Amino acid sequence: MQVLILTVGTTREPLEVALAEHAPQGVVFLASQASHPVAAELVRDYGGSFRHHTLLLEDAESLMEAYQKALLALRKALEWEATAIVADLTGGTKPMAAGLVLALTGRGVVFSYVGGEARDPGTGRVLAGKERLRLLEDPTARLGLKEWAGFTRAWNALNLGMALAELESLLRRDLSPSEARFYGAMKG
């Protein structure tokens, strides 16, 4: 089952693009007091084709609350036994999008964003019919943050064999020249 975690703003069209492109079997809506009606409209119009659950934020500008609700959304997706989870950060406030990304990076979630080139000059929003969905790479995977955390834990515990294994794992990644020199020098 693919589950889409969707931040909801007051503009419906890009969210419809995300729903159509991802075609999820389950959707967890992260909505604010102001955007809850948009989530309700989407459920009314499309809810028959997927399971759905809505999490409501009291303060759409609270990064902490957005982070906590995103973790609850992940928990709901896992309760539904999701085999793939996509988190779309198109709608909602900037703190809602940031909280979603902070909570879900490094957890095997694919991120997506509906953008586009043609924008309304007054609002900056993408023009209807000109939307384009983009899949976004989780930067923690590219940067080797999991391996680096494993290295520091092993090093601090004086488990030098494990620390060496984590460094070797980092050295097998596609690294910049300075990263390769740094990790290589640490390995010795």
Model regions and ranges:
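Long, low-complexity, Lys/Arg-enriched
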Residues: 1-84, 98-188
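Short glycine-rich anion-binding loops that position phosphate/pyrophosphate groups of nucleotides
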Residues: 10-11, 91-93
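Short N-terminal targeting/anchoring amphipathic segment
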Residues: 83-91
